[in-house]
Amino acid sequence: MRLPSIATLFHPLQSFSIRGGIHPETHKHLTSECEIETMPMPALIRLPLQQHIGAEAEPIVKRDDLVLKGQLIAKARGPLSANIHAPTSGRVIAVGHFVAPHASGLPVPTITIRPDGEDKWGPHLPRLRPENAAPEEIAAQVAAAGIVGMGGATFPSAVKLNLRAKYDLTTLIINGAECEPYLTCDDRLMRERAEEIADGIGIMARALGVKQVFVAIESNKPQAIEAMTRYNRALGYTFKIHVVPTQYPMGSEKHLVKMITGQETPARALTADLGVVVHNIATAHAVHLAVRYGEPLIARTVTVSGHGIRRPANLRVLIGTPVSEIIAHCGGFTEEPDRLLLGGPMMGMPIQNPRVPVVKGTNGILALTAAETPEAKTMPCIRCGRCVQGCPVGLTPFELNARIHAGDLEGAAKVGLMDCLACGCCSYNCPANLPLVQSFQFAKGKLSERQSRKHQQEETKRLAAARKAREEAIAEAKKQMMLKRKAEMAAKKKAEEAAAAAAMPPPATATAIQGEATP
């Protein structure tokens, strides 16, 4: 079938302005023309039980169990959690702890599988026909497949798909902005799998019951724009391809909503309050595979880049594959990297141990050289305001930083500390090279710690008060019981005395006695 040209399908849409933002060097040329290739089977697969926002999954396998590809090995613990499946067939060699793919490097509960090389599938999830499926069925299938937000947030996707029960939803926005420097995995996915992505978008739109769908793509991805424009229809929906400016952090959920709809999401509110739900491009692709083919989320596309990587690439990688094996597949390091990151350079997570695994939210592995991360001497703040100009939330980072360093964390919270996205725009703009984001993250952690401690203290007081109230109630109940028993005993005694008195013969009268005495 001959597809219509992009000129007949694509029309620029109205965009609304957003505040702040920066334009860092993108470095996307390193991998933008690298087609997605399949990463070979790793020697070991390590699956942390918490690859998502919410409660960690509960393991349902044990050491030495044989598992099949796609088999459920850890089940969601409650609605805000996610299932985890075996990415290939093999043997479970450990259900214990391993280093987290996190800057802390702390051990976390992990299932380790040694692949058997057969890559043998177990039973798939039941396939659905989304044209006839109820919204609840689609959401349940997405939950069963363990799908989470694959742009990095890792929020369980089924929870979002069920929002129609609580909110009046009108709009679905698919986030294909991919604004982080270096990363091109979503770009390549749109260029190579546009038809499958479109189907996933249609499935999600049907589940949400929205009236309109936008696909947001940055202007520096013309081939992706063309591909998605050609496949802009599915399940009765026609998607509007919205080309957004190449600007960081354009991929931020609330900024996309403002750019496309003109609506400002209030602080601590949800975009669903405005009738809008945002999902990632890769999430749409995972939904397509889960609903149409019954495949759980066991693999994802990852960009491997940076001048420290000998052969930058876009790879289709099994979840749980060690970063070290991926780097080796890409030819190893060109030199010892100055920074090794999971994710992008702005919001990515530095790691010390390359043996950590790729998880569901891992969209990039970056090995940055010293030339890419130049160290600059920090100087005192000159209150130039460049951090304010860059902040997409409209905060005053220099004031936040001053309050934090003065120990006034509550004061920093009052001027918006908890609204910080940790996007890094302020640090990027700062001529004094101050580590603003690190300062804000530290302060947010301290505040959260204080609030947690305060909550624990209040909970302890509440429990103590409740215990005291229970003890007083028990004591009062005992007192009342004793009083009641005493009253009952007194009444019983009185009744017995009355009965005894009634049973005695009446005393003889004087007249009667005299009469008895007369001869």
From Swiss-Prot:
Any one GO molecular function term: metal ion binding
What positions does the entry give for [4Fe-4S] cluster 2 binding?
A: 391, 420, 423, 426
Occurrences of domain 4Fe-4S ferredoxin-type (ranges): 372-401, 411-440
Q: Which residues bind [4Fe-4S] cluster 1?
A: 381, 384, 387, 430
Bound how, and how many: what does the cofactor note say?
A: Binds 2 [4Fe-4S] clusters per subunit.
* An individual GO BP term: electron transport chain
According to the record, the residues making up region (Disordered) are 494-519
**Which Gene Ontology cellular component annotation is one that this UniProt entry carries?**
plasma membrane
Compartmental location: Cellular chromatophore membrane
The Enzyme Commission number assigned here is 7.-.-.-
This protein is called Ion-translocating oxidoreductase complex subunit C
Q: Which gene encodes it?
A: rnfC
